[in-house]
């Protein structure tokens, strides 16, 4: 793949939240809420966008009843070694998007405004959003992760929500995180 080509992008189903059903118009019924992450297969190394629900928090387990796929298993299913992941971009720090970031040793990109919001009580599961030392890459606004992959600030769902734009050739894909929520039929 040359720099000009579009990297392959694959979706990971990281959890299904049983206690928060969403309407599925094609089936005319409520269905469990899926939690997705993404892998951008970039020549500089895989980039993970969102890491799903964490494992082992009794409050989250009791309230939301998630069926969680360990991030390492989801990556393995796509042929990605967790040790090869070059970067993580978290769309935001709610529990269902940042929960398994600690399973990876690479840099984690988060908006400064999101990081600040996550330090307040009841914003997230603190231990799941705890990113320490050199791994934490605070971003102010738009930024490049690596050539052809950039972060775009998309506040709204949270103060520091961010999306990822992947470009290659004449194509552009936006991994919107949760700045746009469509029904299950569109996911």
Predicted regions mapped to residue ranges:
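Active-site metal-binding loops of divalent metal-dependent hydrolases
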Residues: 51-54, 93, 113-114, 157-158, ...
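Conserved small/polar residues in nucleotide/adenosyl-binding loops
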Residues: 186-187
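Active-site glycine- and acidic-residue-rich loops that bind
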Residues: 152-162
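Beta-strand-turn-beta hairpins that frame and shape the catalytic cleft
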Residues: 4-9, 42-46, 143-151, 168-173
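Metal-dependent catalytic neighborhoods of phosphoester/phosphodiester hydrolases
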Residues: 99-104
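Metallo-beta-lactamase
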Residues: 67-96, 110-153
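Conserved beta-strand hairpin/beta-sheet module of binuclear metal-dependent hydrolase folds
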Residues: 13-73, 77, 163-177
């Amino acid at each position: 793949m040359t720099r000009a080509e579009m990297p392959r992008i694959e979706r990971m189903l990281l959890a299904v939240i049983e206690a928060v059903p969403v309407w599925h118009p094609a089936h005319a019924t409520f269905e469990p809420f899926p939690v997705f992450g993404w892998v951008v297969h970039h020549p500089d190394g895989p980039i993970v966008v969102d890491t799903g629900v964490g494992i082992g928090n009794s409050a989250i387990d009791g309230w939301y009843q998630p069926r969680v796929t360990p991030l390492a298993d989801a990556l393995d299913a796509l042929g990605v070694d967790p040790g090869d992941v070059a970067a993580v971009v978290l769309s935001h720090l709610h529990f269902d998007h940042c929960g398994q970031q600690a399973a990876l040793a690479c840099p984690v990109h988060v908006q400064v405004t999101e990081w600040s919001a996550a330090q307040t009580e009841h914003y997230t599961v603190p231990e799941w959003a705890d990113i320490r030392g050199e791994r934490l890459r605070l971003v102010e606004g738009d930024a490049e992760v690596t050539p052809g992959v950039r972060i775009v600030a998309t506040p709204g769902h949270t103060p520091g929500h961010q999306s990822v734009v992947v470009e290659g050739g004449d194509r552009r894909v936006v991994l919107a995180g949760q700045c746009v929520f469509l029904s299950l039929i569109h996911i």
